[in-house]
Curated annotation (Swiss-Prot):
Role, per record: Binds the lower part of the 30S subunit head. Binds mRNA in the 70S ribosome, positioning it for translation.
Organism: Corynebacterium glutamicum (strain ATCC 13032 / DSM 20300 / JCM 1318 / BCRC 11384 / CCUG 27702 / LMG 3730 / NBRC 12168 / NCIMB 10025 / NRRL B-2784 / 534)
Keywords (A to Z) from UniProt: Ribonucleoprotein, Ribosomal protein, RNA-binding, rRNA-binding
Family: Belongs to the universal ribosomal protein uS3 family.
Domain of life assignment: Bacteria
PANTHER family (alphabetical): 30S/40S RIBOSOMAL PROTEIN S3 (PTHR11760), SMALL RIBOSOMAL SUBUNIT PROTEIN US3C (PTHR11760:SF19)
Record keyword Ribosomal protein present: yes
Protein name: Small ribosomal subunit protein uS3
GO molecular function, one term: rRNA binding
Region Disordered: start-end pairs: 214-248
Domain annotation KH type-2: ranges: 38-106
One GO BP: translation
């Protein structure tokens, strides 16, 4: 089951949070359709901005949209002109006041959606699919929080007449473990031979007691050789005592 189902939907409320934060009684279906239109508008209009995630929060008379992007300068524009244009378009779409927040994604190589988009852009530029996949895997595995990655490309790879699926993975990607923090992203590459689908799974450790594995291991990693609070080794104490006895 973990191999087929969407990793984000399977872990809602466990390791992942909802992408839309609002409550509605009678207008629930209208809000869902509106959220889909907002995300489609942003993904099509800002395809070069590297949008990783869009979080929507609603109140009675206001809509807040958080855009997580790898290139915030493209979304903001010169002197905020592009951000103002996006806000006006969203206000026309929703009929309410829109608060737009633009957040930068600092670690691009550890975000599944951005990794999938990077591979798709390389395939569009006629880069060999194996080279693009391996390069993305190597870049992701260099990140300290990434424990494993799996990449799948499907379509007319290399311009072949018959479509096929190629898979590459490195490290652990436990899709059946509910406490595992799995980041999942997809993207489509539009080539002269047709569309090629790219899927990426990134495993970032387990979530124990509401805390991520990277947050738990961070204090232990900080305590290194140069840390003054680190406990001295027993061997060093014995050596000091032996030297003091010899001097005495």
């Amino acid at each position: 089951m973990g191999q087929k189902i969407h990793p984000h939907g399977l872990r809602l409320g466990i390791t992942s949070d909802w992408k839309s934060h609002w409550y509605a009684d009678k207008s629930y279906a209208d809000y869902v359709a509106e959220d889909i239109k907002i995300r489609e508008f942003l993904s099509k209009g800002l395809d070069r901005a590297g949008i990783a995630d869009v979080v929507i929060e609603r109140t009675r008379d206001r809509v807040r949209v958080d855009i997580h992007t790898a290139r915030p300068g493209i979304v903001i524009g010169r002197r905020g002109a592009e951000a103002d244009r996006i806000r006006r378009e969203l206000e026309k779409l929703t009929g309410k006041q829109v608060a737009l927040n633009i957040l930068e994604v600092k670690n691009v190589d550890a975000n599944a959606k951005l990794v999938a988009q990077s591979i798709a852009e390389q395939l569009t530029n006629r880069v060999a699919f194996r080279r693009a996949m391996r390069k993305a895997i190597q870049s992701a595995m260099r990140q300290p929080q990434v424990k494993g990655i799996k990449v799948v490309c499907s379509g007319r790879l290399g311009g072949a007449e018959m479509s096929r699926t190629e898979r590459y993975h490195e490290g652990r990607v436990p899709l059946h473990t509910l406490r595992a923090e799995i980041d999942y992203g997809t993207y489509e590459a539009h080539t002269t031979f047709g569309r090629i689908g790219v899927k990426v799974w990134i495993y970032k450790g387990d979530v124990v007691g509401g805390r991520r594995e990277s947050e738990i291991n961070a204090p232990a990693e900080r305590r290194g050789r140069g840390d003054r609070n680190a406990r001295p080794r027993r061997g060093g104490q014995r050596r000091q005592r032996a030297e003091q006895k010899q001097e005495g």
